[in-house]
Curated annotation (Swiss-Prot):
Molecular function via GO: oxidoreductase activity, acting on paired donors, with incorporation or reduction of molecular oxygen
Function text: Catalyzes oxygen-dependent 5-hydroxyuridine (ho5U) modification at position 34 in tRNAs.
Keywords from the named record: Oxidoreductase, tRNA processing
Name the UniProt record assigns to this protein: tRNA uridine(34) hydroxylase
Domain of life per record: Bacteria
């Protein structure tokens, strides 16, 4: 029986002044261990999701932890039957998660970490303002009970949303969460810089909560969007039933895929009447490349979804 693929989400805010020089040895470590996926490195730290065999993931983690700066790198795992990534990349960035506000640095100032087992008690406090820091298409398929949806399409929009809707003098306690912990960690640093006093964030993010909190005690509702070809995971971290529309990025349900407006790789019920002609042509061309690659048994182009392929068969 084939061993399951290990999917590891990892990040750490840590000052890496030599991050440019880290790119090539890190890429080689990924290749040596048979790792697929993308890691982002910047002066503020490292972030990404990768996949491989049990031995491969352990080998990469050992390589990272050999650097004293990354010995306690945050790391969460889930499993799937098919490789969710097709390429191996290390990218140099200005930020490992882009907020776009100069001076916000979780290495210098960050909110209070809340362990998954303590999260329910915190968000049950009526004085706590609970904010989902993810984008609208992620929130649409699952979130915590009572969470506020900022309806952002990019994390860059988060600061403007906070300034427009909340006042540090009125909102004393704020709790935030995101998929793996990185966005809310940076968001907490931003909110502290804006004068909010008590800022909390879920340590390890939604994925760690789903891993550690029994479903019968959970305050999570729905699936959790993930940034690989699984698209979503359920509460037990098994792969969900959603695909993703590669024209608009929106997760599409089984019901969505039964719609006359769903064309794999090209449109879905959420975007079929909103796409520009340029975007539509680009989606059609990409889908043709995917079909050609499949016919030739070649590596899949960017944008390919193996579940979408099997549903078409």
């Amino acid at each position: 029986m084939a061993q399951p693929i290990v999917v590891a989400a990892l990040y750490k805010f840590v000052t890496l002044e030599d991050y440019v020089n880290l790119r090539e040895p890190l890429l080689q470590a990924m290749l040596d261990n048979g790792i697929k996926g993308t890691l982002l490195i910047a002066e503020e730290g490292i972030n990404g999701t990768v996949s491989g065999s049990r031995e491969g993931i352990d080998g990469l983690l050992a390589w990272l932890k050999n650097d004293p700066r990354m010995v306690d790198i945050d790391h969460k795992e889930s499993y799937c039957d098919e490789q969710p990534f097709y390429r191996t990349k290390v990218k140099l960035k200005k930020e490992i998660v882009t907020l776009g506000v100069p001076g916000v640095d979780p290495n210098k100032k960050v909110g209070t970490y809340v362990e998954p087992q303590d999260w329910n008690a915190l968000i049950s406090d009526p004085e706590v303002l609970l904010i989902d820091t993810r984008n609208d298409y992620e929130v649409s398929i699952g979130t915590f009970e009572g969470a506020i949806d900022p309806k952002t399409t990019s994390f860059r929009e988060f600061p403007d949303y906070i300034k427009a809707h909340f006042d540090p003098s009125k909102h004393k306690k704020v709790a935030m969460f995101c998929t793996g912990g990185i966005r809310c960690e940076k968001a907490s640093s931003y909110m502290l810089s804006e004068g909010f006093d008590e800022v909390f964030h879920l340590k390890g993010g939604i994925l760690k909560y789903l891993e550690e909190v029994p479903q019968q005690e959970s305050k999570w509702q729905g699936d959790c969007f993930v940034f690989d070809n699984r698209v979503t995971v359920r509460h037990d971290l098994s792969e969900g039933d959603y695909d993703q529309c590669h024209a608009c990025r929106t997760p599409v349900s089984v019901e969505d895929r039964a719609s006359e407006h769903y064309v794999p790789g090209i449109s879905c019920p959420h975007c079929w009447d909103k796409l520009s002609e340029k975007t539509r042509r680009s989606a059609i061309d990409r889908q043709k490349q995917i079909e050609l690659a499949k016919a030739r048994n070649m590596p899949h182009p960017i944008g390919y979804n193996y579940k979408q392929s099997s549903s078409e068969a």
